[in-house]
Design a protein with these regions (language model features):
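A conserved regulatory-domain signal marking ACT and ACT-like small-molecule sensing domains
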Residues: 1-85
Length: 85
């Protein structure tokens, strides 16, 4: 499982272009949450959790594409999924 944060331009289709990467790489999103930035009106930070580890070559390639399509992107963590009993 990996968690990232990113910010995108406030324009039509910008979030779709990011989410489309997950579809194209067949990666399952487990959580997406938006929070307004403190700096610009109508600009949001998106927190995303998804299945897969950042060191996996396919995931790393997807994250590189996302990084180029965002104002900024940061990997918050990449860790094994836990199973609850």
């Amino acid at each position: 499982k990996t968690s990232i944060i990113f910010s995108i331009k406030h324009e039509p289709g910008s979030l779709h272009r990011i989410i489309e990467n997950f579809h194209n790489y067949n990666v399952n999103l487990t959580k997406i949450e938006s929070r307004p930035t403190k700096t610009n009106t109508w600009e949001y930070n998106f927190y995303v959790d998804f299945e897969g580890h950042a060191k996996n070559s396919r995931i790393a390639e997807m994250l590189e594409k996302i990084n180029h399509e965002t104002l900024f992107m940061k990997i918050l963590g990449s860790y094994p999924s836990a199973k609850l009993n």
